[in-house]
Regions:
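Active-site HxH/HxHxD metal-binding segment of metal-dependent hydrolases
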Residues: 41-109, 113-123
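Active-site-proximal loop/helix segment associated with metal-binding centers of metalloenzymes
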Residues: 31, 116-147, 159-160, 168, ...
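Zn-dependent metallo-beta-lactamase
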Residues: 1-22, 28-32, 37-38, 117, ...
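Cap/insert and terminal regions of metallo-dependent hydrolase folds
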Residues: 52, 82-85, 156-241
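Short active-site oxyanion
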Residues: 3-4, 52, 71-77, 147-149, ...
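Short gly/ser/thr-rich secondary-structure transition/capping motifs
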Residues: 4-7, 32-39, 96-100, 153-155, ...
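Beta-strand-turn-beta hairpins that frame and shape the catalytic cleft
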Residues: 1-4, 16-23, 106-115, 142-149, ...
Length: 246
C-alpha cells in the first residue's frame, strides 16, 4: 500500500492514493518574482482531475493558484477561515465547495481523513472593508491504507509538535525550512535546526523540506543527519516524486 508524494515546487505538493484520489497542498505553481519564488513544475491546468485542494493559510505563496484549480475541476477547497472569505468574495467560489477548517476539525473525503492542527503563524488578508486575521493551520492526512502525513504549512517551532507526534504518530513530515525574500534576506519561520528538531518530535520515518529558495534543502538534510539520524531525509526537486509505503 503506497501514497505517491510529488513535489511541485515551493510549498506545492500533489498526493495520490492507491484509489487514484488526487489532492494538492498549498498549490503555489505560478511563482512570484517579487518574493523570489520560481514557477513550479506544472501549470494549474494540469490538475483538472484533482479532488481536494488544501490551503494552510491565506498568504499568497500558499494559496497560490488554489482558486483557479477549484474553478477548472470538481475539487473542493479545504482551508482556514481567511482563505474561505477570499474564495467567496474574490474568486466567487460557491460556498458548498468550501470546507472551512479550524484547529481540531476533521473531515473525511473518501479514502483520506484531513485533520486541522494549529500552526504557530498568522493568516492575514486585506478585504474591501478592512482586513481579516484567522487561524493558520497544519494538516494531518490519514489514509485508508494506514499512512499518515503531517504537512506543516508555515508553522514555526512550538511544543505541540511533540504532542502531535505522541497523539497521531505521523510517518512523514513535510516542513518549511526557508522563506520569501525580504530586503535580500529570507523570512524564515522554521530554521534548519528547528525543523530537524520538529521532525524528531513528530517521530516520523521520513522528513521532506519545502518553502526554500537557496540551499536550505541540502542544509536541512545535513541537520537531520546530526540531530535525528534515524529519520530519512528526502530531498525532492520540483517535479520529482516518491512512493511511501508502510
Amino acid at each position: 500500500m503506497t501514497i505517491d508524494i510529488r513535489y511541485l515546487g515551493w510549498t506545492a505538493f500533489q498526493l495520490t492514493t492507491e484509489k487514484g484520489t488526487t489532492m494538492l497542498l498549498d498549490p503555489m505553481l505560478n511563482g512570484d518574482p517579487k518574493d523570489g519564488i520560481p514557477p513550479g513544475a506544472e501549470k494549474p491546468e494540469a490538475f483538472q482531475e484533482a479532488k481536494l485542494i488544501l490551503v494552510t493559510h491565506t498568504a499568497t505563496d500558499h494559496v497560490g493558484q488554489a482558486f483557479d484549480i477549484v474553478k477548472i475541476s470538481d475539487a473542493v477547497l479545504v482551508c482556514d477561515v481567511a482563505t474561505k472569505f477570499r474564495a467567496l468574495e474574490e474568486a466567487g467560489i460557491a460556498e458548498d465547495r468550501i470546507y472551512q477548517m479550524v484547529s481540531g476539525v476533521r473531515y473525511v473525503f473518501g479514502d483520506v481523513k484531513v485533520k486541522a492542527l494549529p500552526a504557530r503563524h498568522l493568516s492575514f488578508a486585506r478585504t474591501a472593508g478592512g482586513f481579516i486575521n484567522a487561524q493558520p493551520l497544519s494538516y494531518l492526512l490519514s489514509f485508508a491504507t494506514g499512512e499518515r502525513i503531517f504537512f506543516g504549512g508555515d508553522t514555526s517551532i512550538h511544543g505541540d509538535l511533540k504532542l502531535y507526534g505522541e497523539l497521531y504518530r505521523p510517518h512523514v513530515a513535510i516542513l518549511g525550512v526557508g522563506g520569501v525574500d525580504v530586503h535580500g534576506q529570507s523570512l524564515t519561520e522554521l530554521y534548519l535546526d528547528e525543523a530537524a528538531l520538529a521532525a524528531g518530535w513528530l517521530g516520523v520515518r521520513v522528513a521532506i523540506p519545502m518553502h526554500y529558495r537557496f540551499d536550505e534543502g541540502n542544509e536541512f538534510m545535513d541537520a537531520l543527519k546530526k540531530q535525528a539520524p534515524d529519520i530519512e531525509g528526502k530531498l525532492l526537486r520540483p517535479g520529482e516524486s516518491f512512493s511511501f509505503a508502510l
